[in-house]
Curated annotation (Swiss-Prot):
Gene3D superfamilies: Aldehyde Dehydrogenase, Chain A, domain 1 (3.40.605.10), Aldehyde Dehydrogenase, Chain A, domain 2 (3.40.309.10). It is found in: Mitochondrion matrix. Its main location: mitochondrion. One of its GO terms (cellular component) is mitochondrial matrix. Pathway: Alcohol metabolism; ethanol degradation; acetate from ethanol: step 2/2. Keywords: Acetylation, Mitochondrion, NAD, Oxidoreductase, Ubl conjugation. The modification N6-acetyllysine is found at residues 35, 56, 142, 358, 366, 409, 411, 424, 434. Belongs to the aldehyde dehydrogenase family. It catalyses: an aldehyde + NAD(+) + H2O = a carboxylate + NADH + 2 H(+). The gene is ALDH2. This is Aldehyde dehydrogenase, mitochondrial. The record marks 169 as: Transition state stabilizer. The keyword DNA repair does not apply. In response to mitochondrial stress, the precursor protein is ubiquitinated by the SIFI complex in the cytoplasm before mitochondrial import, leading to its degradation. Within the SIFI complex, UBR4 initiates ubiquitin chain that are further elongated or branched by KCMF1.
C-alpha cells in the first residue's frame, strides 16, 4: 500500500471548480428558477461553491433534448455501434488525462481519502467505461429457427430516454456504472446527481462533449431528490429509470414509475450485509478484511459488512483484535496520504450515525471503542465497534451507513444462516473459512446478490452487482448490466421457402 501511495501524484487540495450549472444539449444553463444550492466540503463544513438547483422544468428541458437526440435518423441513432464504443473509450481517455484533478475534486466534495479516490474510484471508472466500450458492437440478437416458411430474428434495441439517479458515496464510479451500459447500447441519458456531491459528475458531463457525444445524448441535472429526482421518476416521456440509493427512496421511485407510464425500473438499494467468520478462518486475514468490509469509504457502502457474525470459540479473540484495529485506524484530513478515514459526507449523515451509536448504547450493546465525533470541525466520526450485539437491536437491523461495526456471536452454521437471512435486505454477504464444504453451502444458502468467500468488497466491471429482497431490482455491471438498457424485438419475415 505504501508503494502504491508513492505512485499517486500530489493533489491540489483546492481544485478549481469549472462547472456548477445544468448540462443540457452539450450546453451549460442556469436553473429555470435561477435557484442554487451550496455544496459543502465535509472536512471543514465550509461551502465550496453554489450549484444550479435543477427542478421539474429543468428535467423537462433535459428530457426534450434527450428525446430529440433519440429520434430516428439522428446522428446518434445512425451511428455505428463500434463508433459508440470508440466514444466511450475516448471519454475514458479524457478522464484518465484529468485523473489527478478529478480525484482531488472528488475528495474535496465527498471527503473520501484522496489516495482512495485516485487508486480505487478512478481506476474502476476507467475500467468500467472501457469494459462497456468493448460491448458496444458485441451485444446483439440471434436468428431463430422458427417453424414454417419464415425467417425470424431478434434485435437488441435501446430502451430510449433513461433517467439515472446517482448517489453521493461513489459519485464518479456510480456515474460510470450507469453511463457505460446505457451509452454502449445506444440510449440517451438524463442524469440527476446527488446534491451532496455534484461537482465531479458535472466535470465529466463536459468531457462527454469533448469526447464527441452528440448534443442531447448525455444531460446532467444537479438538484434534490424530492424535486428533480421525483420529476424524472414520474416523467411520462422517460422510458426507464435507474436509481442507486436508499430503500426508502427506492420505494418512492417504483411507485412513481407505476403511477406514470410504467417505465422500466432498476434499483440498487440498501443493505445490512452479513459477514460470517467461521472458527477455522485465517484470523489475521479475517480481522483485517472484516475491518475493511465495514470501515471502507467511511462506512458509506451499500454492501458494507455491517453484521459481523463470529463463531463463539473465536469470538473473544476476534473482538479484541478488531477493537485494536479500529483504534489504530487513521482518521483525518483526506488529502493526507496516511489518512484511512475522512469525514462523513454531510451534517445530516454525521448526526444520523451518531444517533445510531446512541441507540446501540441505549439498547444494551457493548461499546468497545469510539462512539463520538473525531474532530472539532468537519463531519468526522471515531471508528466505533459494538460487541454483544443482539439480532433485535436497531443497530443490527437498520442500515447505519457509517463507521460503526456490529459484532454478533453464533454457534452453528445452520443457526447463522437463519439469522443472516432474517433481514429485509439481501445485497451482499461474505464467509471466511478454510472449509470448502462450509463455503460452498453458505454461498448457496445466503440470500444475497453477491457472496464473497475469504474476501470482501471485490468488484469488477465484468461481475454483476445487485440485490435480493428490498436491496433492489435488476443488476448493474457485467454483461447482465446491459439487459436493463435494451428492448428485445422479434422480427419475423415470410419467405418463399425455408431451407436448413
Amino acid at each position: 500500500a505504501a508503494a502504491a501511495t508513492q505512485a499517486v501524484p500530489a493533489p491540489n487540495q483546492q481544485p478549481e471548480v469549472f462547472y456548477n450549472q445544468i448540462f443540457i444539449n452539450n450546453e451549460w444553463h442556469d436553473a429555470v428558477s435561477k435557484k442554487t444550492f451550496p455544496t459543502v466540503n465535509p472536512s471543514t463544513g465550509e461551502v465550496i461553491c453554489q450549484v444550479a438547483a435543477g427542478d421539474k422544468e429543468d428535467v423537462d428541458r433535459a428530457v426534450k433534448a434527450a428525446r430529440a437526440a433519440f429520434q430516428l435518423g439522428s446522428p446518434w441513432r445512425r451511428m455505428d455501434a463500434s463508433d459508440r464504443g470508440r466514444l466511450l473509450n475516448r471519454l475514458a481517455d479524457l478522464i484518465e488525462r484529468d485523473r489527478t484533478y478529478l480525484a482531488a475534486l472528488e475528495t474535496l466534495d465527498n471527503g473520501k481519502p484522496y489516495v482512495i479516490s485516485y487508486l480505487v474510484d478512478l481506476d474502476m471508472v476507467l475500467k468500467c467505461l472501457r469494459y462497456y466500450a468493448g460491448w458496444a458492437d458485441k451485444y446483439h440478437g440471434k436468428t431463430i429457427p422458427i417453424d414454417g416458411d419464415f425467417f425470424s430474428y431478434t434485435r437488441h434495441e435501446p430502451v430510449g430516454v433513461c433517467g439515472q439517479i446517482i448517489p453521493w458515496n461513489f459519485p464518479l464510479l456510480m456515474q460510470a456504472a450507469k453511463l457505460g451500459p446505457a451509452l454502449a447500447t445506444g440510449n440517451v441519458v438524463v442524469m440527476k446527481v446527488a446534491e451532496q456531491t455534484p461537482l465531479t459528475a458535472l466535470y465529466v458531463a463536459n468531457l462527454t462533449k469533448e469526447a464527441g457525444f452528440p448534443p442531447g445524448v448525455v444531460n446532467v441535472v444537479p438538484g434534490f431528490g424530492p424535486t428533480a429526482g421525483a420529476a424524472i421518476a414520474s416523467h411520462e416521456d422517460v422510458d426507464k429509470v435507474a436509481f442507486t440509493g436508499s430503500t426508502e427512496v427506492g420505494h418512492l421511485i417504483q411507485v412513481a414509475a407505476g403511477r406514470s407510464n410504467l417505465k422500466k425500473v432498476t434499483l440498487e438499494l440498501g443493505g445490512k450485509s452479513p459477514n460470517i467468520i467461521v472458527s477455522d478462518a485465517d484470523m489475521d486475514w479475517a480481522v483485517e478484511q472484516a475491518h475493511f468490509a465495514l470501515f471502507f469509504n467511511q462506512g458509506q457502502c451499500c454492501g458494507a459488512g455491517s453484521r459481523t457474525f463470529v463463531q463463539e470459540d473465536v469470538y473473544a479473540e476476534f473482538v479484541e483484535r478488531s477493537v485494536a484495529r479500529a483504534k489504530s485506524r487513521v482518521v483525518g484530513n483526506p488529502f493526507d496520504s496516511q489518512t484511512e478515514q475522512g469525514p462523513q459526507v454531510d451534517e445530516t449523515q454525521f448526526n444520523k450515525v451518531l444517533g445510531y451509536i446512541k441507540s446501540g448504547k441505549e439498547e444494551g450493546a457493548k461499546l468497545l471503542c469510539g462512539g463520538g465525533a473525531a474532530a472539532d470541525r468537519g463531519y468526522f466520526i471515531q471508528p466505533t465497534v459494538f460487541g454483544d450485539v443482539q439480532d433485535g437491536m436497531t443497530i443490527a437491523k437498520e442500515e447505519i451507513f457509517g463507521p460503526v461495526m456490529q459484532i454478533l456471536k453464533f454457534k452453528t452454521i445452520e443457526e447463522v444462516v437463519g439469522r443472516a437471512n432474517n433481514s429485509k435486505y439481501g445485497l451482499a454477504a461474505a464467509v471466511f473459512t478454510k472449509d470448502l464444504d462450509k463455503a460452498n453451502y453458505l454461498s448457496q444458502a445466503l440470500q444475497a446478490g453477491t457472496v464473497w468467500i475469504n474476501c470482501y468488497d471485490v468488484f469488477g466491471a465484468q461481475s454483476p452487482f445487485g440485490g435480493y429482497k428490498m436491496s433492489g431490482n435488476g443488476r448493474e455491471l457485467g454483461e447482465y448490466g446491459l439487459q436493463a438498457y435494451t428492448e428485445v424485438k422479434t422480427v419475423t419475415i415470410k419467405v418463399p421457402q425455408k431451407n436448413s
